[in-house]
Amino acid sequence: VKIHGKSGHGSMPSLAVSPIDCFHTFYMALQSYRMRKVSPRNCLTYSFGMVQAGDTPNVIPDELTFAGTARCFVNEDGLSFREDFWKLLKDICDNYGCTAEIMEDQYFPVTANNKECVDLARKAIAERVGDVMEDTEPWMASETFAITESTYPGLFTFTGVKNEALGTGANHHTPEFDIDESGLKVGVEAALAYVLAMLEEKPEIKSFHKEDLKLMLERAE
């Protein structure tokens, strides 16, 4: 997002419209959003990973650019946050005499596995590969595969690549990240076991209702 203000000199701030002041007010106002709008039973988080404005200490810049992400486990929470985010930003920009320009806005739905697909995979993988599947805690990484699962029933799994003997298993997006490539073999075997079971059994996925997701996907466009 880019906030446009009016540049000026630090000796006469009254002649400028500071996008920094505008962003600060917006940032603070957003802090209370979760307490006011998100059920305590649900989880929503957001962060700004980039804020850039100006390059001279005595000059008020004419624009500020910021970027970040929001994560949730309930699509309705994410879509509501998205709508309220833009409304709050517009209102505060109007108050300060600034304008906001949307540089990029993407929404990926929550990645939610279909239970019947999970049950089929668990059985098939146990028979063909062994007891290698584990349940995990919900994870807030954004995932484009969620778009596929919004149209077709399926499941999303992780392949274990941690091996303390080799020193692998550091968190993603860190300099220490590395993988134990032998884990990829198990991942391929597990994927094939699931695909073969799906082709052989051709289960009826009764819990998947594509029409239920239509409004959510339209709202996310």
Language-model-detected regions and their locations in the chain:
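Catalytic pocket of metal/acid-base enzymes, prominently hydrolases
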Residues: 34-36, 58-62, 149-164, 168
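Acidic/histidine-rich
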Residues: 115-118, 122-123, 128-162
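A broadly conserved detector of short glycine/acidic/proline-rich loop/turn motifs that flank catalytic sites
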Residues: 5-7, 52, 151-152, 161-163, ...
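Short, mixed-charge aromatic SLiMs
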Residues: 48-54, 214-221
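Soluble non-cytosolic domains of exported or imported proteins
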Residues: 17, 115, 182-185
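His/Asp/Glu-rich mid-to-C-terminal helical/loop segments that flank catalytic regions of hydrolases
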Residues: 22, 28, 32, 83-87, ...
